[in-house]
Swiss-Prot record:
Keywords from the UniProt entry: Coiled coil, Endoplasmic reticulum, Membrane, Phosphoprotein, Transmembrane, Transmembrane helix
Family: Belongs to the TEX28 family.
Protein name (record): Transmembrane and coiled-coil domain protein 3
Transmembrane segments: 417-437, 450-470
Protein species of origin: Homo sapiens (Human)
GO molecular function, one term: identical protein binding
């Protein structure tokens, strides 16, 4: 049957996923992001024709959606540009810090001037991009608010247009039904003027609605006449390619219309509409179910696309934040590493300087001790020479004065005692010199020694007073 063939053709067209994907891509290239569903089906000749009639409200909705999508794309682009500018600014800051750490004062001043110019340029560009971003956000909010206010008005307009279109189709059906019967009886091949089933279903539904509202279905003719006066050229639209529609008297009521449709037949050799209505109704029901499923799939796909875009935006935002944080941590780590290297170098230099100073002090102390020991040795040698001279002199005196043995013996003993005393004195002097020599290294040591001796003298002089004071402090009254 032609009706079933039409339903199967539409079913195959919408059920084949590859073709549906290609059709969707073509529609997206022509700025139509949604699948427009057929609102009226007309048949003529040997081909099946689909009449795609898109309401103005849907087109306005698509325009608003396309404008909002373009604004969202611009917002994403501007956001990426802002992130790029911020990363370049951070890179300039890191490079400036590295160059300043390794540069002189003059070079640091020049580098600072260049960095300030770059920083001002990047700040200006970021400010401009932020202004653009705010403008795009404001436009997007305005478009969303305007689209929400228009949608309630467009819904009522679409309902009125659907009612007018269904009544007009019912009027055309009632005028072309007798002609369909004649063509089926004459058996003209290649021409099929059978209107779609859902036209009759729609006309009956609206007839029932109007009957419930106005009390009778006879007022449909008046509504049809008003619609014909509103758009008279739509009623004279032909269904076949070479067939001519002859205007016939209208049916007076819904019963006549139903009887006319039940008696009509196709020109392709099919039975009457009443006989093949079941298969056509099944095909049309399947088509409606498939179209409803396609709508649900389309809505689900749109929701998934929005969720994916939201996830992409969130992922990009989080990725930019994490990358910026990692970059800041890397720059901080590099700065800390440079500071650590500088501190280690400074400590190494300080330890080297301390080692050099300790070595020089040790050399000085060793040299001074050597000089002092040599001086003491020379003094002892001089004393020994003097003692030897005195002994020689004593021997000479003993040889000369043999008479005065006792006197010489006494004199020798005295001299020995004196020499021993002198030796003790020299040893004491050398020992005192060894203890005093560290106190006489510098002026500070000399002053400290002088003050210590002075305090000791004062302490010895006032020893009685000190003892009295101690007794007063210890013994209570």
């Amino acid at each position: 049957m032609p009706g079933s063939d039409t339903a199967l053709t539409v079913d195959r067209t919408y059920s084949y996923p590859g073709r549906h994907h290609r059709c969707k891509s073509r529609v997206e290239r022509h700025d139509m992001n949604t699948l427009s569903l057929p609102l009226n089906i007309r048949r003529g000749g040997s081909d099946t024709n689909l009449n795609f009639d898109v309401p103005d409200g849907i087109l306005d909705f698509h325009k608003v959606k396309l404008t909002a999508d373009s604004l969202k794309q611009k917002i994403l682009k501007v956001t990426e540009q802002i992130k790029i500018e911020q990363t370049s600014r951070d890179g300039n800051v890191a490079e400036y810090l590295k160059l300043v750490n390794n540069a002189d004062k003059q070079q640091a001043g020049r580098i600072k001037q260049v960095f300030e110019k770059k920083n001002q340029k990047s700040a200006h560009s970021i400010a401009q991009l932020q202004k653009k971003l705010e403008q795009y956000h404001r436009k997007l909010r305005e478009i969303e608010q305007n689209g929400a206010s228009r949608s309630s008005k467009d819904i009522s307009k679409d309902h009125l247009k659907d009612i007018h279109r269904s009544l007009k189709d019912a009027h055309v059906k009632s005028r072309t039904a007798p002609h369909c019967m004649e063509s089926s009886k004459s058996g003209m091949p290649g021409v099929s003027l059978t209107p779609p089933v859902f036209v009759f279903n729609k006309s009956r539904e609206f007839a029932n609605l109007i009957r419930n509202k106005f009390g009778s279905a006879d007022n449909i003719a008046h509504l049809k006449n008003s619609l014909e006066e509103f758009r008279p050229e739509a009623s004279a639209r032909a269904y076949g390619g070479s067939a001519t529609i002859v205007n016939k008297p209208k049916y007076g009521s819904d019963d006549e219309c139903s009887s006319g449709t039940s008696g009509s037949a196709d020109s392709n050799g099919n039975q009457s509409f009443g006989a093949g209505g079941a298969s056509t109704l099944d095909s049309q029901g399947k088509l409606a179910v498939i179209l409803e499923e396609l709508r649900e799939i389309k809505d689900t796909q749109a929701q998934l696309a929005e969720d994916i875009e939201a996830l992409k935006v969130q992922f990009k935002r989080e990725y930019g934040f994490i990358s910026q944080t990692l970059q800041e941590e890397r720059y901080r780590y590099e700065r800390l590493e440079d500071q650590l290297h500088d501190l280690t170098d400074l400590h190494q230099h300080e330890t080297a300087n301390l080692k050099q100073e300790l070595a020089s002090i040790e050399e000085k102390v060793a040299y001074q001790a050597y000089e002092r020991s040599r001086d003491i040795q020379e003094a002892l040698e001089s004393c020994q020479t003097r003692i030897s001279k005195l002994e020689l002199h004593q021997q000479e005196q003993q040889a000369l004065q043999t008479d005065t043995v006792n006197a010489k013996v006494l004199l020798g003993r005295c001299i020995n005692v004196i020499l021993a005393f002198m030796t003790v004195i020299l040893v004491c002097v050398s020992t005192i010199a060894k203890f005093v020599s560290p106190m006489m290294k510098s002026r500070c040591h000399i002053l400290g020694t002088f003050f210590a001796v002075t305090l000791l003298a004062i302490f010895c002089k006032n020893w009685d007073h000190i003892l009295c004071a101690i007794e007063r402090m210890i013994i209570p009254r």
